[in-house]
């Protein structure tokens, strides 16, 4: 790959807007960007002298998530290339030393796909800056067109036309014709701009401004309270009684001046204006229609068993399965998608047989072996091992 192509690929991979644009449609396959980054990460780790285990994990991840015909998501690569890559990765996982050219067959088709997608993205984003933009309002009489004056777009179009129709201006007539053409173009653009400004001013004049033309807001709407309607039923009889007695408010200027509390009912009604009437909360035995229902435990709920797999120095992978079944090593491999020829050993946590420790790690390698359950869960750890001799196949 040339220096120019390398710079172009770096610009594509680091363009966050381009990545978001690819995610909008499945056909653009945004995973191709992530795959290309992962390949560069693999090569960088190889050059820096990372351990073989780290390279194997990364190669396994790239193959399973993007390249594999069964589980891969990067479908822009031809099936023949993906099959070749699967063969390469399996050879490395079976004991062959990792090498920096492992993913070279993927780089060229990925680069071509990213270049074509970025060309389409550049064209699309350039077309978004349209010179004309139609706008409409709620009222049919207020509909109009808003003109957006884009100097950059006009400048690009002018340069394009000039490059197609090159005028040498050698004679006086050619220069005069060019002068008239420029004046005609400028006058047309000026009229377009003036028309746009006129339409904008008309829209502002017709717009429904809540503050009016003089900048003052209209007075707020009156809030009329209906005290008797909003008053709870337990206060209704007491309210009517006080209204019939024509109670007058007394002087309340002093502290504890025996002021009438008749105003409190008015305030109570006003504060509850426009709110939902809630039932009496003084009686806990009443049925509240607005209360949150307490969750009821279903009697037929199926119990789950947690199955955990952890690679060395890696985060655990967890699965939930039905607890009413016996789990074999074959089902365990199928559950986590583990390849049959992987050079790894699975150790399962179980109760210590001699009682010298709280638990022990038991090695299981037969597909029909039943996995031990320790503390209501199955816990496994995977360790990478060198390939066994040809006359001993444990897995």
UniProtKB/Swiss-Prot annotation:
DIX domain span: 301-386
Record-linked PROSITE patterns: DIX, RGS
GO process terms (BP): axon guidance; cell development; negative regulation of Wnt signaling pathway; Wnt signaling pathway
Annotated InterPro entries: DIX, DIX_dom_sf, RGS, RGS_sf, Ubiquitin-like_domsf
GO MF annotation, one: protein kinase binding
Protein's name in the database: Axin-like protein 1
One Pfam family linked to the record: DIX
Region (Disordered): 190-230
Keywords (A to Z) from UniProt: Developmental protein, Wnt signaling pathway
SUPFAM superfamilies: Regulator of G-protein signaling, RGS, Ubiquitin-like
Cystine connections: none
Record-annotated RGS domain positions: 4-132
């Amino acid at each position: 790959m040339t220096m120019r192509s390398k710079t172009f690929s770096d610009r594509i991979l680091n363009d966050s807007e381009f990545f978001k644009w690819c995610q909008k449609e499945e056909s653009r396959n945004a995973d191709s960007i992530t795959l290309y980054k992962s390949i560069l990460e693999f090569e960088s780790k190889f050059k820096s002298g990372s351990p073989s285990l780290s390279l194997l994990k990364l190669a396994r991840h790239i193959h399973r998530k993007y390249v594999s015909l069964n589980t891969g998501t990067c479908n822009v690569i031809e099936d023949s290339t993906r099959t070749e890559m699967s063969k390469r990765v399996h050879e490395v996982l079976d004991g062959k030393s990792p090498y920096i050219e492992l993913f070279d067959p993927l780089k060229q088709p990925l680069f071509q796909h990213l270049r074509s997608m970025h060309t389409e993205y550049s064209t699309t984003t350039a077309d978004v800056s349209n010179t004309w933009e139609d706008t409409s309002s709620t009222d049919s009489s207020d509909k109009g067109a808003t003109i957006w004056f884009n100097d950059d777009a006009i400048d690009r179009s002018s340069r394009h036309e000039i490059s197609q129709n090159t005028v040498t201006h050698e004679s006086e007539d050619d220069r005069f014709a060019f002068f008239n053409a420029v004046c005609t173009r400028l006058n047309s653009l000026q009229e377009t701009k003036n028309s746009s400004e006129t339409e904008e001013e008309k829209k502002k004049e017709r717009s429904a401004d809540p503050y009016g033309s003089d900048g003052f807001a209209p007075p707020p709407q009156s809030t009329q309270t209906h005290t008797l309607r909003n008053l709870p039923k337990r206060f209704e009889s007491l309210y009517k009684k006080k209204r019939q007695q024509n109670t007058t408010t007394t002087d309340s200027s002093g502290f504890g001046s025996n002021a009438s509390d008749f105003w409190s009912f008015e305030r109570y009604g006003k504060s509850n204006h426009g709110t939902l009437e809630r039932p009496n909360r003084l009686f806990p035995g009443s049925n509240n229609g607005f209360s949150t229902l307490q969750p009821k435990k279903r009697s037929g709920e199926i119990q789950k068993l947690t199955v955990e797999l952890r690679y060395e120095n890696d985060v655990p992978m967890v699965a939930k399965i039905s607890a009413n079944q016996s789990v074999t090593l074959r089902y365990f491999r199928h559950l986590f998608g583990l390849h049959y020829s992987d050079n790894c050993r699975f150790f399962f946590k179980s109760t210590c047989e001699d009682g010298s420790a709280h638990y022990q790690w038991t090695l299981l390698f037969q597909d029909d072996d039943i996995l031990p359950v320790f503390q209501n869960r199955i816990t496994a750890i995977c360790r990478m091992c060198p390939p066994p001799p040809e006359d001993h196949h444990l897995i």
